[in-house]
Every structure is written in C-alpha cells, then in structure tokens.
From Swiss-Prot:
Organism: Ralstonia nicotianae (strain ATCC BAA-1114 / GMI1000)
Organism domain of life: Bacteria
Keyword Protein transport annotated: no
Keywords: Repressor, Stress response, Transcription, Transcription regulation
Gene name of the record: hrcA
GO molecular function ontology, one term from the record: DNA binding
GO biological process entries: negative regulation of DNA-templated transcription
The keyword Protein transport is annotated on this UniProt entry: no
Similarity section: Belongs to the HrcA family.
Protein's UniProt name: Heat-inducible transcription repressor HrcA
NCBIfam families linked: hrcA
Length: 352
C-alpha cells in the first residue's frame, strides 16, 4: 500500500472512531491533509475496499473500516501505544500518561492494605471507570496452598475455619462436627496443622494425613480431615475472572443495537470460557495485546475488541487484565490505560 492510501485509510478510521458515521470523500479531503480531487480519493477508496480494509454500508455512500482495516490500523498506524514505546519528546502523551497513572495509583493505593482479591477487583473497576467500557482481570493462578489456618468455636458442633493463603487472602468455611471440641483443643489442632503442613497444598496435606492418622487421636483425626476438605473448597472456590462495568457496554450502540447483539453480549459474560481462553493466551506474551472481533477467533463477539496486558508478582507473570469494548474505540487512549494499570497492579501485588 502506498503512502497516499495509508494516509487516507488512517484518516478514515480515525474519523469513523470519532464520529461513528460512514466516511465520505469530502471528509477525507478535509482531514487527510492531502491535495487530492474527490475522484482520486474515490479511486483509492475503491482499491482499499478491494483489499478488504474498508466496506460500503448499503445505506450510505461513505465507507467504514473492516476488522482487517482495524488490524492494520492498530499494528502500524497508531500514534500512541504502551508507555515504554511512547516517544519521550511527545510531551502531551506523557502528560496524559501521567494523569492516567495518578488515577490508577490512587484507586489501587486505597485498597493496597487489603487482600489481593480486593486489589484485583479495584483494578477491574479502575479499567472500567477510565475507559468507560468493561474492565476484566484474570485472577492469579492459585496453588491451592495455605499459609496458616485457625479454628473458632461457634457452638458445640459448629466451628469456623479461617484459611490464610500465601497471597494474603482470607477465606472462611463452617465445619459441622459430631464431637464438642474445647477452644484449647482447637488451638492445639491449628498449631499442629500450621507447624507440620503450613505452606503446602491441601492435596499434599491430604496425602500426608493418610500416612499419619495412626499417630493422632481419633477425634483430632476427624477434625483435621474435615479442615482439609473445607479448606480445599475455600481456596479453590474463586471466580477465575473479575469483570467490572458490563452495563457500560449496553450503552454502546455497536454492541447493543439489536436483540441478537444483546443476546451475544450477555452470552460472553455468562459463559466466560471464551474470555478465559483469550486472557490465557495473552498471558503468554509480553506487553499489550489487541484482539479484534471478526479478525481473531479468540474474541467471542464480532463487533468487540479486547485490549490486554499481563501483570506480575515478584517478576513472574500470574495473570492478565484488559478492557472489553467495541471495535470502534479510541485505541490510542485505551492502550495506555491498560498498560499503566498492569504495571501498577504488578507493583501493588508485589508489595503485598
């Protein structure tokens, strides 16, 4: 594609993102900065349509970008991108990035002393608030281990099991027992489990207990077995994806202009399997990834785009976050939001 066609395609996509209306030759002449006749512009548009980068809606003389056109745009034409590739000379871009960073930092800092799960939920909400689309975070892959447990006697036959994970999350489960344990017995049992099994997965503890049951008193054995089963349930019963701002997408005409589009939109969030697959794929790559519906089989809605970035804890990638929005979104604004949030979430979780 020659430079003239590239400029016209870039201008067309920018105007369509800004206005949401098919773009005609008069608009391209006005905004492209090229001194071309309307006939020449129409010829170039015809060539771009043949190449599959733009299409003509039946109701308009103008053109709109196709998924292939958006792909070329985000890969080669964007003037903004992740922070580490923004030119330092671009003072305005740096000011925008700084403003976004301060907003994200303030949101995450207010939850910094809380569990990692709440910090992750705050990150999803921040992504949604700043982008005005849906924010999504794939939670860290869990080892289903525990750092320590505690027992709290609620009644003669009801005990509250408190499980603290290596990530600092706290989960609770109620255990029903046939034996009336005293508070001192519960402290003794918790101390034994923490001293011998702290830091292990519940599956590993289950295996160890099978070989050590003879050394324990019968009533302690049943309590520990119940604690292992309840604890395993507590740490594994966690939604792998946190989503915030789904309702904002109902206000996006491109995604909700018909009942069929609405049904497909709700299916995306109800099933989550497609989103999980997409987030898992993006966690294996470095930096910001852009997935465009109709162009990527990973995007579960043809009019949708997903911008993602992996986040780390202590230098190791543990999950992915991103923004779900329409294909017609301001990529140069949303990409830095995703990039900064991933970096600051990594920093916040690593300090936990």
């Amino acid at each position: 594609m020659d430079k003239r066609a590239t400029i016209l395609l870039k201008t067309l996509i920018e105007r369509y993102i800004a206005e949401g209306q098919p773009v005609g030759s008069r608009t391209l002449s006005k905004y492209s900065g090229l001194d071309l006749s309307p006939a020449t512009i129409r010829n170039v548009m015809s060539d771009l349509e043949e190449m599959g980068f733009i299409a003509s809606p039946h109701t308009s003389a103008g053109r709109v970008p196709t998924p292939r056109g958006y792909r070329l745009f985000v890969d080669t034409m964007l003037t903004a991108g992740p922070l580490d590739i923004l030119g330092m000379h671009d003072r305005m871009a740096q000011q925008i990035a700084g403003t976004i960073a301060e907003q994200v930092r303030a949101q995450l800092a207010s939850h910094g002393s809380e569990s990692s799960q709440r910090v992750i939920a705050a990150a999803a909400q921040t992504l949604s608030n700043l982008s005005q689309f849906a924010g999504i975070v794939m939670t860290p892959r869990r080892t289903h281990a525990f750092r320590q447990i505690e027992f709290l006697r609620l009644s003669e036959t009801r005990i509250l099991l408190i499980v603290v994970t290596p990530e600092g999350d706290v989960q609770n489960r109620i255990i029903h027992t046939d034996t009336p344990y005293t508070p001192s017995q519960l402290v003794e049992a918790a101390n034994y489990i923490n001293a011998h099994y702290g830091g292990m997965t519940f599956d590993a503890v289950r295996e160890r207990l099978r070989g050590e049951l003879n050394a324990l008193q019968a009533d302690m054995t049943s309590l520990m077995q119940a604690a292992v089963e309840a604890g395993s349930s507590a740490v594994s019963d966690e939604d792998p994806v946190v989503i915030s701002g789904e309702r904002k997408l109902l206000e996006v005409e491109d995604l909700s202009s018909s009942m069929d589009k609405l049904r497909r939109l709700f299916a995306v969030f109800e099933q989550k399997t497609g989103l999980l697959q997409l987030l898992d794929v993006s966690s294996r790559a470095e930096g910001v990834q852009i997935f465009i519906g109709g162009e990527s089989s990973l995007v579960p809605h043809e009019d949708m785009a997903v911008i993602t970035a992996p986040y780390e804890v202590d230098g190791k990638i543990v999950g992915t976050l991103g923004v779900i929005g329409p294909m017609r979104m301001a990529y140069e604004r949303v990409i830095p939001i995703v990039d900064i949030t991933a970096k600051l979430l990594s920093s916040t979780l690593s300090q936990h």
